[in-house]
Amino acid sequence: MQDHQENDSKPSKERPRASAPLVYPVEPPEPGGALQRIADGLLWARIPMPIALNHINVYLLRDHDGWVIIDTGLQHEQSLLAWPKIAAAPELEGLPFKALICTHFHYDHGGMARWLCNTYGIPLYMSRAEHHTMRTNYQPFPAGPELPPAFVRFYGGAGVSTENLEKMATFLRQDPFITPPQESYIRLRRGDTLSIGQRQWQVLIGSGHSPEHVCLYCDQDPAQPLLIAGDQLISRISSNVPVNPSEPEANPLKDWLDSLDMLDTLAPKTWVMPAHQGVFTGLHLRTQELREHHAFQFDAIVDLLQQHGEMTAAQVMEAIFPKLRNPIDQLLAVGEVVAHLHHLMPVGRVRRRFDDAAQVYRFAAGAAAGDKPLFGVLRVQAAVV
């Protein structure tokens, strides 16, 4: 869960501590258009963002005749000021932008995609699921007195009050970063190889934070393997891994933890280039920290249910994060609490039932035979792969 949320938790046990510090081998660039060299033909810039997480890292990969951009920043004045500065920077040696790769669909990673593609005449590369989600999500929240039924079923079923549902909807209707998506794209698939300059980048796919998140990995230099990680691996925060109204039965934490297993196959010396915070080494240490973080959250939720009996997801959220006041933070936190509850159910640590009178789902510690699907009518046994 995000670090500002972690600070609001009231755990019953001591939170796990890192066994050794990560190493940050490169100083970050100044936000707003300055460039920092990471390796030959690999540059790092920071685009400011007017939110609590106040920047996004973008990277530029030199090809023979131009530069490939990784991620975009929010559709916002700060991005509109930064990108022309980057394009004119002497470090680019007069070469133009030639392509854009978006790791995933979230606004800070793809919000400027349409502008960049149109302004510089470049194509967009993404995975199919991320582009599809970009096209469906980059839409205004419906106006009018009636809230979308799926929104009400999911968050109302999680125990969010009618008053807070309205506050969340008002916040979403006022979203300042909504922007038309870039309609056309070129698909990236797991296992693809991108030849960019002297490097061969392998396309890796992660999931959990978003449906088909692209990471790029190059291990040609054993002394400096490189991973462009997006939001799949960040040094000090755990990316939001939520269940959403569009897929209310999802178990995204299983996908997230499976993606950590995939990242563990990479070289120990890998330089991790995340979308936020610093470039770091210590990949395997960080994946283990994240596993321990989620194990801690699982135990905290089960302890809470054992102490208080049945609770809705919203009640669990309020107990773990009592200081959250911003409607969007509460929305994200409810989705992530539901994700933790969903992950605990198949292993028999949590059960649920539907309260017909209140029209909410209540969770309790322990297993129960015959849990019915939250929103579906068919019981689906997950495949073992």
Per-range role (PLM):
Residues 2-24, 300-385:
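C-terminal regulatory/interaction regions
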Residues 13-42:
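N-terminal amphipathic/basic leader segments beginning at the initiator methionine
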Residues 32-92, 96, 215-235:
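Conserved beta-strand hairpin/beta-sheet module of binuclear metal-dependent hydrolase folds
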Residues 40, 78-80, 84-195, 223-225, ...:
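Active-site HxH/HxHxD metal-binding segment of metal-dependent hydrolases
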Residues 67-78, 167, 171-179, 183-186, ...:
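Metallo-beta-lactamase
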Residues 83, 256, 337:
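Aromatic/hydrophobic pocket-lining residues that form the small-molecule binding cavity
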Residues 111, 251, 332:
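Residue-level signal for the nucleotide or nucleotide-sugar donor/cofactor binding architecture
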Residues 118, 206, 345:
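Short, contiguous alpha-helical
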